[in-house]
Amino acid sequence: VLRAYTDVEDLEQGKSVHGYVIKMGLEYEPDLLISLTAMYAKCGQVTVARFFFNQMKLPNLILWNAMISGYAKNGYAEEAVGLFREMIGKNISVDSITVRAAILACAQVGSLELARWMDDYIMRSECRDDVFVNTALIDMYAKCGSLDFARIIFDRTLQKDVVVWSAMIVGYGLHGQGREAIDLYHAMKQAG
């Protein structure tokens, strides 16, 4: 039930279920800690989510993803990046969900130096050929003001879907490079 309220971001009903969990004495069950962290993070209550995150002695990947995504999606970019750095510092395996949330946070920070660090990390990871990760990298570089690096990612992405093309086109448009955006749009149409 808690997951359903998380999916629709119904904080009030989620709190109601949380109250029931407390009443039943199940608040510190690992699966419920994960669900509570995810629910509060997704609903914008990142401080509460972090409290539950901190209750786990050995947070699993789902919990790390929930917390990093929660920070990134609610404008706590520095916290998301910091938690991602902590995660990789502890040699905890990441997945494309983790990486995309960290990329979103890097884009929000807007630091080209941080963007380059993220890109370097991804190039050494198993996510380097993930089309969703590469699309996020293109968007990140565009938001950090580097269309040159965005284009490098675009060009090295072998499986270009419409979302990859669109990310690069939007990047050009974002920086007033209408001619490049139109040319790339025509190239996309020709590519099929």
Predicted regions and their residues:
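Alpha-helical hairpin repeat boundaries in alpha-solenoid proteins
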Residues: 1-192
